[in-house]
Amino acid sequence: ESYNPRTNGTIYKSHENINKVRKLAAAFLDEDLEKAQSFYSANATFYDINMPKGESMTLDQAKESQKFFYENFEILSMDEYGYPDFLDYEHRASKVVLAWWDVRVKRKSDGKIINFINHETYTFNREGKIIRQSSYYNGAALNN
């Protein structure tokens, strides 16, 4: 059976929310957690592919996790891999930025340089704050 094609919103390659994600990345590179947190809603949730299924972190827990990361790694670069898209869905009025990052870090314990690809989805509320972030990367790469 054939279905009629239909749309579900608009995809942007230039948008204010994409700019916010870029500013967020710059804040992480500068290790400015206060500035980074300003892009999030107070009740934001964080998901990570390396966490057990169904688990998430609060904004405060994510901040502590980032501090732990800074204690153990130096971020050398975080470059856009391709370009981010902003998806303004009609269904449920979801607003999502999809971004791929080519990340290069130095592990402080032994000086090893590690490269990995990180895919992030950032869901925004109507006020333009991030309410959900999902991270997809190979966490084992950081420990090898």
What do the predicted segments below correspond to?
Residues L24, K35-Q37, A44, A62, ...:
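Hydrophobic pocket/interface hotspot
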Residues E1-E34, S38:
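Short, low-complexity N-terminal intrinsically disordered segments enriched in polar/charged residues
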Residues K63-D110:
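Surface-exposed, charged secondary-structure patches
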Residues W100, I114-H119:
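Short, surface-exposed coil-to-beta transition loops
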Residues S109-I114, A141-N144:
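A short acidic/glycine-rich loop-to-helix N-cap element
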Residues T7-N8, T45-M57, N72:
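A short gly/proline-enriched turn/hairpin at secondary-structure junctions
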